[in-house]
């Protein structure tokens, strides 16, 4: 006692008093707890000695710090513990004066109290007096659990039966005179958290019998709606009537609502402390973020795709092997940002595919074949069009490549890159299967131009039916014919398509006129009177129009079909004139 200077008395109870003292050498404040032994029962004396021994053995950052203890003149048990400048939680609730604590602060406090209880329960210690006046707040707003005067050390499967504690925080099994275990502390902590949340006791009554009835029936008022449903449900789970249905401290620390705060508390706590839940969570976290270097290549690719959507911290544990052809997860994350920004734009599919392919080539390793970035998509040969998907296999998203579209699939509504695809399937296999159906690589070269021309009926199927000239904007790029295109293939293809439509609908005058137009186009004398490029564009425009009309007919969208075919009536312009008008529109767009 000579080492301490008494400053003031800060508390007084039935069994003793609490004094604020300062260590004369350290100049640090402590709390001296003096428990009177004179004129006390043997049970009270044993309890005082037990508290002195127990608090000297426990070591946890969220339990009051033990400094010293002794028995003074056989009349007092003196225990020196750390001083918490914030006072106890009961005083903090009074100071709040109706202003609710934030959910974040309550979650942090709850995590710290659960860690303290989990430490005690793992060492077979029951606190038995968890209440707001025994929860202390340190200067940094962290929590300390104190007052082990009623604590009990259990054997492995032992239960307590003594009716001790504060009535408002007693669990139903204790009031029913049923042996109780560690779940009684969970109930008491639930009462404390309820009081800290609602700023009122969980159970309150005018007499003892009414209080017992409320506790045994677990009747509590609703918590403030200011807090989330998950947090309120967490508190209610701690106040379940049956102890078997109440979660343990370790189970509560694994609750998704508290997991972020468990990690925050672990980072701030001292690494020398023995905290079982924090150590376990840290171990699990490290296991999740560690990549073994000897896994097979397919598993590594799946891991890289999964981690590219996670946080940046996962990348530091990545260990790509030197023989791996794909980029590492670090590059995958960087490229995910740029790819997502490109695909988020509503652009033509060929332009989006060209941009995404170019970015994949930049980050590709030297062992993979490179494709020049400056080449436009419509000048690729059939073999070159297969290379970009190989380099972009490990990308998070992919855009539909336009050069893989055959003429019989022009009306498929999947040509724009405005919506990112959620699948991770590589587009290479699909591209190979489509190209195997083509006899000539010239048709594949011609595919991007056909894709842009067919954009006019495609937009009509996705949006309400609009005039044709609204769809022919300069954003679709040039529609001029490359010099190396085999025109005979295009002309024959157009004739076959039109004849098929004519066979299906022989009484249609527009079908006969279209067939006659294609027959006239095959005549050399007729072909000399028309520009070859205009004829080709008109034929393909009519092809797209007929295919879209067939699609509307198949979908029984007769009203839209009538609007579309209205210009082809007997009193309207002929199909030939309409085709010429379409050709002029394409020429104006190209110029």
From Swiss-Prot:
What catalytic reaction does the record list?
A: L-seryl-[protein] + ATP = O-phospho-L-seryl-[protein] + ADP + H(+); L-threonyl-[protein] + ATP = O-phospho-L-threonyl-[protein] + ADP + H(+)
Enzyme class, spelled out: transferase
- In this chain, ATP is annotated as bound at 10-18, 33
The scientific name of the source species is Oryza sativa subsp. indica
Family, according to the entry, reads as follows: Belongs to the protein kinase superfamily. NEK Ser/Thr protein kinase family. NIMA subfamily.
MF annotations from Gene Ontology: ATP binding; protein serine kinase activity; protein serine/threonine kinase activity
Q: Where is this region: Disordered?
A: 309-331, 387-408, 500-534
- Ranges of Polar residues compositional bias? 391-408, 504-534
Name the job this protein performs: May be involved in plant development processes.
- Per UniProt, which keywords does this protein have? ATP-binding, Kinase, Nucleotide-binding, Serine/threonine-protein kinase, Transferase
Q: Which residues form the Protein kinase domain?
A: 4-258
E.C. designation(s): 2.7.11.1
Q: What is this protein called?
A: Serine/threonine-protein kinase Nek2
- Where is the catalytic site? 129 (proton acceptor)
InterPro entries per UniProt: Kinase-like_dom_sf (IPR011009), NEK_Ser/Thr_kinase (IPR050660), Prot_kinase_dom (IPR000719), Protein_kinase_ATP_BS (IPR017441), Ser/Thr_kinase_AS (IPR008271)
């Amino acid at each position: 006692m000579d080492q301490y200077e008494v400053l003031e008395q800060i508390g007084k109870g039935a069994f003793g008093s609490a004094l604020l003292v300062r260590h004369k050498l350290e100049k640090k404040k402590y709390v001296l707890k003096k428990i009177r032994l004179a004129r006390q029962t043997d049970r009270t004396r044993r309890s005082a000695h037990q508290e002195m021994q127990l608090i000297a053995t426990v070591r946890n950052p969220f339990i009051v710090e033990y400094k010293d203890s002794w028995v003074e003149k056989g009349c007092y048990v003196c225990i020196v513990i750390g001083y918490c400048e914030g006072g106890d939680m009961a005083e903090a609730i009074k100071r709040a004066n109706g202003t609710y604590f934030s959910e974040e602060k309550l979650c942090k406090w709850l995590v710290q109290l659960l860690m303290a209880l989990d430490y005690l329960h793992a060492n077979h210690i029951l606190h038995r007096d968890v209440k707001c006046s025994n929860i202390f707040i340190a200067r940094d707003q962290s929590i300390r659990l104190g007052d082990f005067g009623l604590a009990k050390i259990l054997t492995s499967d032992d239960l307590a039966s003594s009716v001790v504690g504060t009535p408002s925080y007693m669990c139903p099994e204790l009031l029913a005179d049923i042996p109780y275990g560690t779940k009684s502390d969970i109930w008491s902590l639930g009462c404390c958290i309820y009081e800290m949340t609602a700023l009122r006791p969980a159970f309150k009554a005018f007499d003892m019998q009414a209080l017992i009835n409320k506790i045994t029936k677990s009747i509590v008022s609703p918590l403030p709606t200011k807090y989330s449903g998950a947090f309120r449900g967490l508190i209610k789970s701690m106040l379940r009537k049956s102890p078997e249905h109440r979660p343990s401290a370790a189970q509560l620390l694994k609750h998704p609502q508290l997991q972020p705060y468990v990690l925050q508390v672990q980072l701030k706590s001292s690494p020398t402390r023995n905290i079982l839940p924090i150590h376990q969570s840290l171990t699990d976290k490290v296991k999740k973020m560690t990549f073994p270097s000897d896994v097979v290549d397919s598993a590594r690719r799946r891991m890289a795709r999964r981690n590219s959507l996670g946080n940046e911290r996962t990348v530091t544990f990545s260990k790509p092997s030197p023989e791996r052809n794909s980029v590492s997860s670090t590059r995958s994350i960087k490229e995910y940002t740029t790819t997502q920004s490109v695909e988020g734009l509503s652009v033509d599919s060929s332009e989006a595919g060209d941009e995404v392919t170019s970015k994949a080539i930049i980050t590709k390793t030297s062992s993979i074949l490179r494709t020049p970035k400056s080449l436009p998509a419509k000048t690729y040969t059939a073999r070159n069009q297969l290379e970009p998907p190989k380099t972009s296999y490990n990308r998070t998203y992919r855009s539909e490549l336009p050069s893989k579209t055959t003429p019989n699939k022009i009306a498929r509504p999947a040509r724009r890159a405005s919506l990112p695809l959620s699948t991770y399937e590589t587009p290479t296999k699909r591209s190979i299967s489509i190209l195997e159906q083509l006899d000539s690589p010239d048709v594949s070269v011609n595919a991007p131009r056909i894709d842009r021309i067919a954009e006019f009926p495609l937009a009509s199927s996705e949006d309400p039916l609009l005039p044709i000239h609204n769809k022919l904007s300069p954003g679709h790029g040039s529609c001029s014919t490359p010099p190396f295109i085999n025109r005979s293939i295009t002309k024959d293809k157009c004739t076959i398509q039109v004849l098929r439509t004519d066979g299906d609908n022989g009484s249609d005058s527009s079908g006969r006129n279209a067939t006659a137009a294609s027959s006239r186009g095959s005549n050399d004398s007729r072909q000399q009177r028309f520009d070859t490029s205009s004829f080709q564009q008109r034929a393909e425009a009519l092809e797209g129009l007929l295919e879209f009309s067939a699609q509307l007919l198949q979908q029984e969208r007769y009203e839209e079909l009538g609007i579309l075919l209205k210009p082809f009536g007997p009193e309207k312009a002929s199909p030939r004139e309409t085709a010429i008008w379409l050709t002029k529109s394409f020429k104006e767009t190209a110029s």
